[in-house]
A protein has these predicted regions:
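Extracytoplasmic "Venus flytrap"
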Residues: 48, 52-70, 89-91, 168, ...
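Glycine-centered hinge/linker elements that transmit conformational signals in sensory
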Residues: 201-208, 246-276
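Short, low-complexity disordered leader/linker segments with a strong preference
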Residues: 1-55, 77, 382, 430, ...
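Short, polar/charged alpha-helical segment
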Residues: 61-83, 177-178, 411, 429
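C-terminal lobe and pocket-closing loops
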Residues: 135, 300-311, 320-413, 441-442
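Extracytoplasmic "Venus flytrap"/periplasmic binding protein-like
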Residues: 70, 74-146, 159-162, 181-183, ...
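Hinge/lid segment of periplasmic solute-binding proteins
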Residues: 115-171, 198-201, 224, 234, ...
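Extracytoplasmic/periplasmic solute-binding protein
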Residues: 41-42, 156-165, 170, 180, ...
Length: 443
């Protein structure tokens, strides 16, 4: 069989996707005797004019960065006594720089953290508890205003360390032009997104074509982009978990996980509606109109909107298994441990403002964590964001475990081995489980 013209791409589009597999300096902090934040001065800057200076770090280098700058600008105008200095650091180096700043001083007063990283950082006691601010703000501003899953992600143990800014779930992007050409339409003649696996497979088969007659498909019904989030979504729909309830053992070789991985393999080799993980860039192929469907995060919306001539829409992820599930994550707003009381209160004011103002954030391609804002007409008018937001009741995050960031580099090669047809799901996940367990057993 000749190589496919498509390949999977796990590259992160600048400013949209986020890098998880970065080397962490937290182990170095531990070797040096624990987090040094308490020994240094965080959040103590004051401008010559008497203003409180807040340093705010994030990794928003794309269109989301422009939206954040606008939100911060609005805060500055409404709070002339607070000077916010925003620094944008590419995600590829962001966590290394943040780690060093938290350990040795100079940490920002407010910083963005992905939900999956909070347990890791707080396991080294680097974050400031925010419980007193939530207590002072309740009941007008608190748990009832947020979606349950991102709200829970702000806790480590019994204490709360963050404000959830958004939720970025995976969903289905589909090419409306190819759908209409294949006759996959509703009563109004509009492209009809699949809701079930049967509908999904039927649509994928109709759109997989050899348009130039060379014996190989050059138009595909579906393509895997980020294998990790695709697998987590499908596995979640089969009721799978990555770790045992106590977080001490891997459950990657459970029947539910294996069924999900087998289904992904079958889409390539049995149903032949998706390309093998090799060839050209899979996400680029979707952007260029050569693929009918892709499961991707809401954070990729901007790259589609920038693509001239692409007719697309968004929908919830089809239900491949017996239950609804969709992978997701969140950007959280945090403060460093050891921040002064004055700066902590000013930082909280900024954090609350960004949450309150997150309809601007939504327009940049995110789903607000705030339930009241998602009900607003301005958000309802954002068609793709609104469609993806319908999944929040069953969105599933990666394990909120201190070692989550360390275990996924051990899992992803197994997923790819199955997709390349060089390992069975059982063999690949058995080996991945062994490697993950070795990490979990370490102190």
């Amino acid at each position: 069989m000749r190589p496919s013209k498509f390949r999977f791409s796990n590259r992160f589009t600048p400013g949209t996707r986020f890098v998880w597999h970065v080397p962490s300096a937290l182990a170095l902090v531990a070797v040096l005797g624990g987090c040094a934040a308490s020994k240094t001065s965080n959040g103590a800057a004051t401008a010559p004019n008497g203003k409180i200076v807040l340093n705010f770090w994030n990794g928003f280098t794309g269109p989301d960065g422009k939206a954040m700058e606008k939100m911060v600008g609005r805060f500055r105008k409404q709070n002339p006594n607070i000077e916010v200095r925003m620094q944008t650091i590419p995600w590829g180096t962001y966590y290394d720089k943040l780690t060093l700043a938290l350990a040795y001083g100079g940490a920002p007063d407010v910083f963005v953290m992905h939900a999956g990283r909070l347990p890791e950082f707080q396991s080294f006691e680097t974050l400031q508890p925010l419980g007193k601010f939530y207590a002072e703000s309740a009941p007008a501003w608190g748990e009832k205003q947020f979606a349950p899953v991102p709200w829970r992600a702000t806790f480590y143990g019994a204490k709360q360390y963050a404000v959830p800014l958004d939720v970025h779930p995976i969903g289905l992007y589909f090419n409306t032009k190819l759908f209409k050409e294949a006759g996959i339409i509703d009563a109004r003649g509009e492209a009809k997104a699949p809701r079930t696996f049967e509908e999904f497979l039927d649509a994928a088969r109709r759109m997989t074509k050899d348009t130039n007659g060379d014996g190989r498909p050059d138009q595909w019904g579906f393509v895997f982009t980020w294998q990790r989030t695709n697998w987590l979504t499908i596995a979640g729909q089969f009721g799978a978990n990555i770790l045992s309830p106590d977080g001490k053992k891997a459950t990657l070789d459970s029947p539910q996980n294996l069924r999900a991985l087998q289904l992904m393999h079958d889409l390539i080799y049995k149903h032949k509606v998706a390309p093998k993980p090799e060839g050209v860039d899979a996400w680029l192929a979707f952007r260029q109109g050569k693929v009918g469907m892709a499961l991707e995060g809401i954070y990729m919306l901007a790259s589609l909107e920038e693509q001239k001539g692409l007719a697309f829409a968004g929908a919830p992820a089809p239900q491949f298994g017996p239950q609804k599930a969709a992978w997701g994550g969140s950007h959280l707003l945090c403060q460093p441990k050891g921040i002064s009381e004055e700066h902590s209160r000013a930082a909280w004011k900024l954090m609350r403002f960004l949450s309150d103002d997150s309809l601007i954030w939504a327009r940049a391609g995110q789903v607000p964590a705030r339930a009241d804002l998602r009900r607003a007409p301005q958000f309802r008018s954002l068609k793709v964001q609104n469609q993806f937001a319908t999944q929040l009741p069953f969105v599933q995050y990666e394990p909120l475990h201190p070692k989550s960031n360390a275990i996924f580099p051990l899992i992803e090669p197994g997923i790819e081995a199955v997709m390349l047809d060089i390992a069975t799901p059982k063999a690949a996940m058995r080996d991945a489980s062994r490697r993950v367990n070795q990490v979990l057993e370490r102190p």
